Each structure stands twice: as C-alpha cells, then as structure tokens.
Amino acid sequence: MYAPLVSLMITVPVFGQHEYTHALVADLEREGADYLIVDNRGDYPRIGTERVSTPGENLGWAGGSELGFRLAFAEGYSHAMTLNNDTRVSKGFVAALLDSRLPADAGMVGPMFDVGFPFAVADEKPDAESYVPRARYRKVPAVEGTALVMSRDCWDAVGGMDLSTFGRYGWGLDLDLALRARKSGYGLYTTEMAYINHFGRKTANTHFGGHRYHWGASAAMIRGLRRTHGWPAAMGILREMGMAHHRKWHKSFPLTCPASC
C-alpha cells in the first residue's frame, strides 16, 4: 500500500451542521492535512482558506465521498479518505494513517473510535486531542465509512464505489468495499496510532429523521449486500460486525519498522 512517496487527501461531505465541520476543520489545520469539503447544501461558511467543492445538488455522504476519492486520485494523491464532519481527530492523525509500519498489503485503513464497529472501539474513550497513541494495529474485516482510507491501487482494483446500490443512505458501502478489497487480496487494518470521537449521524438524522433513517438504511444495506455478494457473504460480514462474534478481530499486533522505513 505504501510507496516511497505517500500523500493523503481527506474529503469531508457536509449538509449543514456547520458547527461540527468548523471544529473538525480546526483539527485538520492543526494536522497540516490536505482536505476538501463537499458542500452538499451549498451554504457552507468558510472560517479560513478551506477548499470547498459545491456540486449544486445533494450527493449525500456516499456521492460526496466518491467525488472526493476521484478528485484525490486524479490529482496524484496515493491515498484518499472520507471523514464524517461530526468527528474530532487525534494528534498525529494523518501521519498515523500513512504509517509505513502498517502491513504492506494494506488497502484500507481506519482509526480507533469512541463509538463504532466493535473491533475498532478503544477501551478508553477520551477526547480526541487527549488520546495517547499505541504503536499497534488490528487486522479487521471492514473499515467503517465514518473514517476510511483507501490506497489508489485498492480503489482501482475494486472499481470504486457502487453508488447505484448503496448511494442513497451509504450504509453497507463500506462493507461492500471491504468484501471487494479482501477478494482482491488487500488487507484491512485499524491503527491504534489514530483515534476519533464520533458524535453520531448528526447530519443524517437531521435530514431523514432518526428512526426513519435507521430502518430505511438498514434495509437498503442488507438488500444491497445480498444482491451484490449473495446471502452467505452478506450475513458473514454482518455477523463480523457484532460484538459477540469473531473476537480474533480485536487482537492487536505491534507496529514494527520494515527494512525500507
């Protein structure tokens, strides 16, 4: 995954909820990150020199993320990331996601969470700025779309995002990418060097309504995974999301420096 020259562009799809985005922008500026805000509602108020793309329609999280990935790779970045606007990130975030000590087959990487997929949830849940990184990583079945990095090679291998199947809500898109990346021979990892606070579907709940969003998104996810990968694969990865299943995904390994680093 990590060539001698690595670079990352982070895309933040937004639809209102500007106070969350502004707080995240402060974190990204602190980290020296290259980032793009995809302004789905067309009313994002800059607080500095943010790069903003206004598509003129609501692409949603999925469409906004896909736009960011395509732009990043067209502009020559080796890696691209989608990051929810209702998050805060730990110190050293960008460097942690591009860590040369991660396994060489890494196609998708994500941080630890305070709330998220169970195998990526930290035991302690501090404010992101107070997180103490650990030089360890976990081999995981999927990387949550809230904060998901892909290499350009992995993106090309899986053929990008399937917006026709998963585009409306975005649920299941990360699982679909995970299944396709694994089938293509890429490893999926969570690094304990990076961590986020996630405040939880603020934009989606505002736009769709909490219960309506949850049930509609869940049903669309299951239908999409079944149609694309079949019942065994769909049910298999959904089971792997459960806290009680496959405790092996919680096991961590030390980050060690390869001969080339």
UniProtKB/Swiss-Prot annotation:
Which Gene3D superfamilies does the UniProt entry name for this protein? Spore Coat Polysaccharide Biosynthesis Protein SpsA, Chain A
CDD domains registered for this protein in UniProt: GT_2_like_c
InterPro entries found in the cross-reference section: Nucleotide-diphossugar_trans
Q: Which SUPFAM superfamilies match?
A: Nucleotide-diphospho-sugar transferases
Task: Enumerate the PANTHER family for this protein.
Answer: GLYCOSYL TRANSFERASE, RHAMNOSYLTRANSFERASE WBBL
Q: What is this protein called?
A: Uncharacterized protein MT1576
